[in-house]
C-alpha cells in the first residue's frame, strides 16, 4: 500500500465532500462509503423523508462515471422493473429469453432499493444471487454485474421467520436513522439553497475503476493480529452466553472481518486494530433490543479489554494488596510498643511508655494517613504526661493533628500487639510509630512494579492515540475509551503517591 497516510487523507476529504448539505448524516455517509469501497451492502432503517435515498444518490459521486439505479418496491413490483424488460426482438428472432439490462440494476454500480421488504419472491431470489456472487443470469448466459454498493431501505424490520431473513442477513451494515435533532442543524436544513442532486465531489477525489479493483486486492492483505482476534472471539463467546443476544451467522462474522480490514486499509494501517471493532455495533444487531445489547457488549469490550484496561487494573490491585502486606509487616516492626503493667484484678488493663521515650512532647507518625476532623493527618503530637495518664487510667486523649492548632479529641486504643492505633469515624485504623522508625516512601519492590505498570499503560495509551485516527468511528466512542484509559492512569499515579 503506497503512501497510506495520503490515501487516508483522500478518503477523509472524499467523505467530507459527500457529507455537504446533509445534516446529522455524517456517520451514515461514512459507513456507506466504507461499504461501497469494500463491496458490501447497507440497510437503512427509519421513517420516510429523512434522506435515505439522497444518501445512496450521493455515493454515486464517489466514483468516476458510476451508474446508479434506484427503485421503490411495492407488492406489485415485477422483475422487469428491477432487472430490465425482456427483449422482444431476441425472443421473436432467435427464441432467446434475454433481458435488456441497460439502465437497470444489472449494469449499475450503486443500487438503492426502497421499501425492500415489499419485494416479491421472484425479485428476492435474483437479488440474493446478485449480492452473493455479483452475477446475473440473463437467459442462457451468466453475466458479472458491477454493483459496488447496495443500499436497501425501509421504515420497518423484516418479519421474523419470514423468507426475507436470508436477504436481511446479506446486508452487513445496518443503520437506524432518525429525523434531524439539533436545532441549529434543523434551521440550516430548512434554509439551505443547495441542490441536493449536484455533484459535490471534485474530480481529483473520485475513485477510478482501476483504483477500486486494486484496493479490493489490497484490502484482503490487511492482517488480523492475534490480540484483535482474541477480542473478537471474546465478544462472540459473550454473545453466545446471553439469552437475548441475536444470532450471528458465520457468514456475517466473515464479512464483518473484511469490513474491519477495509476500515484499517482506508485509515492508513496495515493491520486491523481494536478501534476498528467498534464497527461491529452496526453489523451484529437484528432489532431494537439487540441493537442496545450489542452496543453495551462492545462498550464493555472497548473500555475494559481492548487496551488492557481491566488487565492493568487487576495487576494494580495485586500490587496494592502486596503493598498492604508489606506495610503491615513494617508496621509490626516499627510501631511504638507500650509496656503492659501488672494488675490482673483491675477493671482496666494499664500500660506505660517504654523507658527510652523521654521527650516531653511526642510526635507519632501514622503508618497510613487518615482523615481526622476533616483533615488529612500524617502525624500527631501528644503531651507526654497526657499520654502516660491515658495509658494508666484511660479516659479522654487529645493530640495536635499534624502538630498544628489545638489538641483534638482522638479515638485511640491499644491493640493486642500492644501498639497504639488511632481510628477515624469509619473505624479505619492506623498504627502509630516514632519518627525515624517508619519506612519512608514506597518499598523498592512496589515502586518497580508500579513503574512497569505505568510504562505498560503509556504504551497502551500511545497505541490508542495512533489508532483513533479512524474516519469511520464516531467521536463519542473514542471519548469513552480515552476516559477509561485516563481512569486507569489516574489510579496508577495515585498508588505511586501512597
From Swiss-Prot:
Subcellular location: Cytoplasm
Classification via InterPro entries: AAA+_ATPase, ATPase_RavA, ATPase_RavA_C, MoxR, P-loop_NTPase, RavA-like_AAA_lid, RavA_ATPases, RavA_LARA_dom
GO annotations of cellular component type: cytoplasm
Reaction catalysis annotation: ATP + H2O = ADP + phosphate + H(+)
Keywords (A to Z) from UniProt: ATP-binding, Chaperone, Cytoplasm, Hydrolase, Nucleotide-binding
TM region(s), chain numbering: none
Source domain of life: Bacteria
Binding annotation for ADP: 23, 49-54, 196
Enzyme superclass (EC): hydrolase
EC number: 3.6.1.-
MF GO annotations: ATP binding; ATP hydrolysis activity
Family annotation (SUPFAM superfamilies): P-loop containing nucleoside triphosphate hydrolases
Gene3D superfamilies: 1.20.58.1510, 2.40.128.430, P-loop containing nucleotide triphosphate hydrolases (3.40.50.300)
Activity regulation details: ATPase activity is stimulated by ViaA.
Pfam families attached to this UniProt entry: AAA_lid_8 (PF17868), ATPase_RavA_C (PF12592), bpMoxR (PF20030), LARA_dom (PF20265)
PANTHER family: ATPASE RAVA (PTHR32204:SF0)
Family to which this protein belongs: Belongs to the RavA family.
Quaternary structure annotation from Swiss-Prot or TrEMBL: Homohexamer. Interacts with ViaA.
Protein task: Component of the RavA-ViaA chaperone complex, which may act on the membrane to optimize the function of some of the respiratory chains. RavA functions as an ATPase.
Protein name: Regulatory ATPase RavA
Species per Swiss-Prot/TrEMBL record: Escherichia coli O139:H28 (strain E24377A / ETEC)
Taxon lineage: Bacteria, Pseudomonadati, Pseudomonadota, Gammaproteobacteria, Enterobacterales
